[in-house]
Structures are given as C-alpha cells and as structure tokens.
C-alpha cells in the first residue's frame, strides 16, 4: 500500500502556506478540498515538481509577465529548509524525470487555458501591481540612501569613540552589499552556506515594520546604537541590523498589504492595551479608608478583648492594642481586659464608658411585669373584654349562674354538686364579650380563689339569700380587696322560700360593702340563677362597670398571660388553660410557662373549637409544653424557640436547686426537733388528681390536718391516671395512693393487687380529708366498701328516641348486674358516676351478664357514651368493724 501524505505536511516541507499548496494541487487536477486532504507518492512528486519548476530562474520578458510574477511569488515563499530538502531529493527526481515532464506539460496546458480566460483581468492586475512595485522600490531606494548617509555618519562617530569596534563593523558592512545582490532562493541558499549556524526549516517572512517605506528609522538599519542615554539598546542593535539586511528582499504585494494591515491592527491593540493598563493602574491605587466616628458612649462588659472593643469603637484591633501600649498596658487582641482598663481606654478616646447591665431573662415574673407596663403605656391600645370572676361560698349558685349565662348545664355533672377547678368561659352579650372565671367555693380551694382575684377585672360575689354570709364569702371579699378589684354583689336564690336579701345586705355592710341604695358605692343585684330573674340587669351592671374602668390592651405586642388550670391528657400530653392578658397569642409561638417551655401546637377556645390566635382577655386551651405547668404560672412569648428552651431549662434548674436547699440537714441546733419528728408517725400518701389546681389544693388541705403524734407526708403529687410508677413508689415507701377524679390503669391495678398497695379513689375533696383525718385518729369505721364487680368495653352505641343512648358492651372480666353502680371512664378520667338504668341480653332483660358475653346497657341521666369507653361496675358491700 502506498504511503500517503497530507497537504499541510507537503506545505511544511516546502515552507509554503497551506492555501497555496491546496490551490496548486487543485490546478494540477487533484481531488483536494483542504489542507487535511491526502495525496499519494505520485501526486506528491508532481506537486513538488510543479513548485520546483516554478522556482527555476528564467530570463523574464515583458511578454511573459504572468510567469515572471508567479516565479517571483514562489521564489519568496520558499524557505531555506525547503531548498535544502529539494537538493537532497535530486537523485529521486532524476529517476522519475519522464513522469515529471509529462505532468509539467499537462500543467502548462491547463495554465495556458486559464490564462486565456482571465487574460484581461490579469493584465489589469499586473499593470497595477507593477506601478505599485515601482513606487515602493523608489521609496525603498530613498530610504536606503538615507540609511547609508546615517550609517556613514555613525561609523565615523564610532571610529572616533572606539577604533576597535569600528574595525568589527567594517567587516560586517563589507558583507552587506554582497548579501543585498542575492535574490530569491539562490540568495537565501548562499547566505545559509556563508553562515556558520545551521538554519532550520522556517518560513522567511519580512517584518511588516521594515517593509514600510515611511517607517525605516536608524534603529532598524543601524546594527549598533550610539552610547547615549541607554547603553542596553546599543548591544541589541547589531542583531536588528543583521535581521534587516538578511530579510531585505522582494516581497509579494498581497503579503505586504496583509503585513501593513496587521501592523495597523497591532498598533491599535497596543494603544488599547496601554489604555487598559493605565486604567488598571488607576484602579489599583488604594483608596484611603474613611474612619467611622466614635460612638458617644461605650457600652461595655467586663472581660472584653481588643477585638470586641474595636467593633464597638469602629477601630482596628491593632490600633486598640497600640493605644493600650501607649497607656502602659501590655496586651494582645484576644486577652481579656478588666473594667478599669476599658474605662481608661474610653477616657483616652474622649468618650463616656458605661457598663452593660445584664437582665436575667429566666426571671419571667419581672419580664411579665415589664411587658404589662409597656402595654399600658402603648399608644396602640384597644378596648378589650372584661374578665369577671364569680366567687362565693360553696353551693351558693355560682356555676348555676354561669350555666344560665352560657345556656349550658355544667353544674349537674359536677361531683357532689360542687366546683373543684377553675373554669374559664366567654359569653357574647349585645355584641360585646365578657370572660367569666368560675372558681371553687370549698375551703380547700383558697389558692384558686386568690389566683382568680389576681387576674380578674371585676369580682361578682354570689351570696345565697337563704344562707347569708359564710366563711368562704368573707375569704372571697378579702381576696378581692387585696387585689384591688371592684366587687359586684349578686344576691342569689331570691325565689326560694325563706330568702331574705335585706339580711344579706346588712351582713355585708360589716365588711365594707355598702349598697348604692343605702348611700354606698357597691352595686347589689337581686337575682335568681335558676329562673333567670334579673340576670340581664346583672350583665348590664358588669358592662357599665367595665366602661367606667376603660379596660384596654395592645394586641400587637408579644402575648403574656396566666395559667388558670393545667393537666396531663393521655392523647395530647400537657394541656394548660391560659388567660391571655396582653398581646395576641398565635399558634407556633415559642413560650415559657413557669418552669416549662415549648411551642403552641394546638389552641382551642372554651367551646372546643380550634383557633389560630387568641386576643386579649380570651381564655384558651393550649398544648405543646414539655411538662405540666403549675396553676397561676406566668406565660411569656419569646422571639425564638432556642431562647425559650434555654430560659425554661434554666428555670427548671433553679427550681431544683431551690428544692434541694429546702432540705434540712441534721445539726446540733435542730437535733432535738429532728428526733421528735422521727418519733412521730407519718401517713405517707401518693396523690394523683385530674388537674394541677386540684392536686395543689388537696396537698395543702391534707398537710393542714393536725392530729397529735401523726402527720401527713405527701411523697409525690401529680396529675393524670394512676400508673405503674405510682404503684412502685407507694410500695417502696409503704404508702397508699389517693386518686382524685382519676382511675388506675389495668396494669397498675394488677400490680397494686399483687404488691398489696392500697388505692383510694375519690371525687369529692372533703371526703378525702375526712377519711385521711379519721385514719390518722384511728377512728376510721368502715361501714360500706366499694367493690368493683366487673369491667366492660363499649363496642357500639345506638341512639333511640325517648330512651337515650344504648351502649353495646363486652364484659372483659367479672360481671355486671342490673342494680350495679356504673362509672364511665375515658382516657383514665372519670366522666360520669351513676347507676345502671337497664341491662339486656339480646332483646331480653336480664339481672346479670358475666365475663365473655355481650350486653346492651343504658345509664341513668347520661347519654354521652362513646365507643372504646371503659365501664366499671361496682357494688357497695358492708364491711364489719375490725
């Protein structure tokens, strides 16, 4: 297979541009398109021969101007390397001479035909080119003459300055005329042979600057510059002179024009680059940094370093360090500085130094007071609903009055007919809202009444007309007066026989409550909560009193409030009933409540509907806290959850440390008292209640029971159902468990039976106190004991008119009878305690249903039965006295 070469390789060997070789190959009839086209050996030989025959020097005549111009162009294009390579290939060319002659003949015929077609255009171009060449030759001759004169004057000057160097120049100058006479490829070859250094195969291109007739200068012609301002330029002149003399030859017109064009472009680029560099130099000039003014006051903290002070003073840390060094203080940028040094530095700068006062963000009580004062001073205050607390003695009709206002029936579902936790409700009257707080009237709930008086605007004191002033009535008056809250007296039960409202008014005058009809300033309204008589008048008096007080709040600030009640719910976790006092509480707000923290996850109003925000004076129920807060704890909203978490954790830590400090250790001073206490008998109790307020009230009431030689010790108090941990704690402490409105879980009940732990369950507070006191005195005479006979699970419910709700239940264990007592337990909380109304098996009435069977059951006066409710059947059995 014959080896092939590409066009650019042939052009490289010949030292000719690629496009000229491509053009020549196309003229020879070769199928080539670009410099990447391939040629075989024969085609390469023809192509090289064509260039060789074109380079052969012939006497030019006027008739053959076209051939002479082509020879001149080709002669200039050939490089030294190409000539040398062609000389080395003479033997090869002689062997193939016949083929070359045939190819040259064919090529000549093609050129003749092409010349005939382009003869007019070619003759015009040749004439123009000849005129241009003559003009440029004349310019070069004038430039050469000028250069010769300049060279002679310089040579004379150099001879005077340095005779030895002038001799060397004579030798070089004597060579110059000989080199100028050489032309074309023969001149290049003669110069290469005369030089000592071998010349590589490079294309010889004249410098554009040297081909211009107008730009020949002394620097381009003179090989050695005179020793005037810059001696370095003198050494470079001989090389430039040699290059100029070597390349002083005829150049094709199109290359000369292209060189001139590229020279202009180069000059434009140089000017542009010069401008860019100058602009960059201008930009690089560093701008002077403007110093910021010093602050009027330096608010510092002890322990700051130079970097911290530099930021406050708007100065570099190095400047601060230098200033301190001048003041005699050796320090670095990271070393802490004391108070005196910082004040000395501030005095040096001529500004006042003020130490920063740290606020304890964990003290939310102070923060609560501050927010309250800011809200009162705010200019964006709006009217808010009044908060009214209903107070009075037990069973005087407080909850019945509230039921009348809300059109509900809360009092019938309360154990023993008494309220044992604070309830918060909001009522709309004549397009205005009133928030009511229902407080317990029992003596054990004194703290609840005190909390209700602290967060309220108006106190409605309910006094029964047939009962008169009672101890809790007097206590409520004291709470209201200590809180500075106005009192409106509602004399209730005027519809009952034997009611004497005037007698009640006379009794209240002893405590400073004088009716307006008798010349006083206390509003008295005679009402009947049961029939609704004069209730509307009472509401009008409440609104009138609220208008006089001009109750306002700023809804735009961060919310603050107070916990009314708190409990632990099985499905929702910690639940807190909160009264918003200032600002607007929104879902998602990070909050701290007492020693707990969290984010408001779900918020519901008093009607059980979910809300997104709570405005001032609105009672809401919130979830999302990490633990159950205490009743009366303050609620404060923080900027972010991270801050709220840190504050809550710090408060919990402080509370734990305070609890540890309260533990008394045995010392010589209290040794005798400690021995007396150890000799006393203790009744250990684990107390569990449904809400935090009830647990707190029970604990305080039980601890107040005084029996000589015996005392009550509450080892644990909490909210929620009785669980296994409570039973374990009671078993380890030899205590019994008191459950108030709660029930034990099945696991806890089984564990208590196995370990013999006594669990007492109550739903009325005074029964707890009576039983504990009787047990302490040793006079507990059990007459009847409650015995649980069975447990049922509600699987389906049906509502039947005139009958109520029928529960389809399955007896899990034990049995249930038609005469059994029944409790409805939902999520561990007792919802109702009553009696069985009817018991059926299929369609037949039965007396008893045992374990493993289904039954239909209805409960007296209770229809709110739901699927998965637990029913507990029990009987009261007589227990003999031991």
From Swiss-Prot:
Its main location: cytoplasm. GTP binds at residues 392-399, 438-442, 492-495. One of its GO terms (molecular function) is translation initiation factor activity. It is found in: Cytoplasm. The keyword tRNA processing does not apply. It holds the Pfam family GTP_EFTU. InterPro entries: EF-G-like_DII, IF2_II, IF2_N, P-loop_NTPase, Small_GTP-bd, T_Tr_GTP-bd_dom, TF_IF2_bacterial-like, TIF_IF2. Residues 528-530 are annotated as: G5. The keyword Phosphoprotein does not apply. Residues 392-399 are annotated as: G1. Residues 417-421 are annotated as: G2. One of its GO terms (cellular component) is cytosol. Residues 50-299 are annotated as: Disordered. Disulfide bonds: none annotated. Belongs to the TRAFAC class translation factor GTPase superfamily. Classic translation factor GTPase family. IF-2 subfamily. This is Translation initiation factor IF-2. The lineage of its organism: Bacteria, Bacillati, Bacillota, Bacilli, Lactobacillales.
